[in-house]
Design a protein with these regions (language model features):
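Short glycine-rich anion-binding loops that position phosphate/pyrophosphate groups of nucleotides
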Residues: 7-9, 39-41, 155, 179-180
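Long, charged alpha-helical interface segments
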Residues: 161-163
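Short, structured active-site "lid" loops
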Residues: 1-13
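Structural motif
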Residues: 2-4, 64-66, 147-151, 173-175, ...
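Acidic, glycine-rich loop-and-beta core segments that form the ion-binding/anion-interacting portion
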Residues: 165-203
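Cap/lid and interdomain-hinge subdomains that line or gate substrate/regulatory clefts
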Residues: 13-15, 21-34, 40-158
């Protein structure tokens, strides 16, 4: 199930209310994967909308966040968003007429809008085993972190993070342009069962 909020270029309060209300309306205990789709160049009310979905679900889950889309040239390294190897603030996105991006640090962008404790899942962690990544998530969850901003350069990182999120057994949402959500959703299906509409929810 997918709902379009058209909230990228509206006020923060309106964006929050749209995401919060739609999540409340359609949330269900059988949904495995909640996705807050975000722009791969971080335009819009990203932090606000992540908070809105987490607030609506109200079960102390985490947000796994990355604007990376490796196959489209979007990567995150050291917390910085690169577009075809160039910092996003040095691309045409910096002069976007509606949502100019002046900062390439993903954590700084989200911190400016979110009330939650944020941590970077750096490339040093992402390159390690699934078990190490899962333990990192669990340990930092116990320390109070609720938003995990993931470095991501290639498909291997997408696979490892996806497996680790599920292995951690911690409830989550995913905020990304789609590749991470797609992989987690794929791994959430136990063949030959087919995912029903109740299993996946995206905004």
């Amino acid at each position: 199930m997918s709902c379009s909020t058209e909230s990228r270029s509206i006020s923060e309060s309106d964006a929050y209310n749209k995401v919060f209300n739609i999540t409340k309306k359609y949330m269900h205990e059988n949904i495995i994967v909640y996705n807050k789709r975000i722009d791969s160049t971080m335009r819009g009310n990203v932090g606000i909308e992540i908070d809105a979905m987490l607030d609506a679900l109200d079960d102390d889950r985490i947000a796994i966040v990355s604007p990376a889309y490796p196959s489209a040239g979007r990567t995150v390294v050291g917390g910085y968003l690169l577009v075809n190897g160039v910092l996003v603030e040095d691309t045409e996105m910096a002069v976007d007429s509606k949502n100019p991006i002046k900062i390439s640090n993903v954590i700084d962008l989200i911190k400016a809008q979110s009330k939650r404790k944020i941590i970077s899942m750096s490339i040093d962690i992402v390159r390690k085993s699934v078990k190490v990544i899962a333990n990192f998530i669990k340990d930092k969850y116990e320390e109070g972190f609720r938003i995990f901003v993931c470095d991501m350069i290639n498909e291997n990182h997408i696979n490892s993070i996806s497996q680790a999120v599920l292995e951690s057994k911690i409830k989550f949402i995913v905020a990304d342009p789609s590749p991470l959500t797609a992989k987690i959703s794929e791994l959430s299906i136990t063949p030959p069962r087919i995912m029903s509409r109740e299993k996946y929810y995206a905004l």
